[in-house]
């Protein structure tokens, strides 16, 4: 066993003292993931992947299985917590230049894609009204991609419509994809540990390192307990806050809900998809909205790693965060004049961030050279 792994094993990994609470979200993601696997297991035990029985089995879990309501709400709200944590985790990586650890960043982005796929399969498994319509829409969008994709969609979901085979495939795929995501997470963690984390101040912090245990373990535990508190309070008092009222009726392929909107964590990608009138273009933009994260390590031009001392980049970063929220909000609205325009402008600004990133770095380098 290499020396470094040995250190990690005993929690003696040297870590910079100045990494802030933004670095705690990785451990929270691990906790979310473990909880999703556990609750998902107990739900899957009682779930029936049949088009006629899926909805009834969900109702049965909620009403008849001991603590089934708790498992279901923990699983549903845990997914939302998971996505909140992962979005913060990515934003922190963007802000502090963590993406310059290319291996870690690329494995993490693949993880994000896998996670979104898994969450989608999980949502489709319930066979409720909103879920069925969303599944149909996603299948249609996937089929739009290319000539080959139609065959692939048919192979995966068995038909264009959500049929019994689709529910079975989605239930199995949610379980399989979660296991694959756990494996990829291990790879990401190993890659992250091998190259040490970026210090926030972007200076070399070798002289100022402390052991991970007990200092950062307790710091992680604090944020973790806060997250668990939020989770349990949400599950107890507002279990349906992230839910769609349409999900309380059984899926009916003949009746389309008035506003088909996915879970909140997909709204951002969905808003970008919707802002483009062309079907193929929308599907491409949807893929690009996530894939563009892969380009960030290769377009970093600034001589400074972190955004902490880069005011222009800070402005752009917070604009990006605001844009993300605006797209998420606009995607919940119907497709009508003001909202379509807002979506289009916000999507343009979102993509502009990644194009402006190298240009701003170049400008800042020139400014610093002159002084």
UniProtKB/Swiss-Prot annotation:
GO terms for biological process: mitochondrial electron transport, ubiquinol to cytochrome c. It is a multi-pass membrane protein. The chain crosses the membrane at residues 25-45, 69-90, 105-125, 170-190, 218-238, 280-300, 312-332, 339-358. GO terms for molecular function: metal ion binding; ubiquinol-cytochrome-c reductase activity. Binds 2 heme b groups non-covalently. Keywords: Electron transport, Heme, Iron, Membrane, Metal-binding, Mitochondrion, Mitochondrion inner membrane, Respiratory chain, Transmembrane, Transmembrane helix, Transport, Ubiquinone. It holds the Pfam family Cytochrom_B_C. It is found in: Mitochondrion inner membrane. The keyword Electron transport applies. PROSITE patterns: CYTB_CTER (PS51003), CYTB_NTER (PS51002). Its cofactor is heme b. InterPro entries: Cyt_b/b6_C (IPR005798), Cyt_b/b6_C_sf (IPR036150), Cyt_b/b6_N (IPR005797), Cytb/b6-like_sf (IPR027387), Cytochrome_b_C_euk/bac (IPR048260), Di-haem_cyt_TM (IPR016174). Heme b b566 binds at residues 89, 188. One of its GO terms (cellular component) is mitochondrial inner membrane. Heme b b562 binds at residues 75, 174. It comes from the Eukaryota. Belongs to the cytochrome b family. Heme 1 (or BL or b562) is low-potential and absorbs at about 562 nm, and heme 2 (or BH or b566) is high-potential and absorbs at about 566 nm. Component of the ubiquinol-cytochrome c reductase complex (complex III or cytochrome b-c1 complex) that is part of the mitochondrial respiratory chain. The b-c1 complex mediates electron transfer from ubiquinol to cytochrome c. Contributes to the generation of a proton gradient across the mitochondrial membrane that is then used for ATP synthesis. PANTHER family: CYTOCHROME B. The cytochrome bc1 complex contains 3 respiratory subunits (MT-CYB, CYC1 and UQCRFS1), 2 core proteins (UQCRC1 and UQCRC2) and probably 6 low-molecular weight proteins. This is Cytochrome b. It comes from Eryx tataricus.
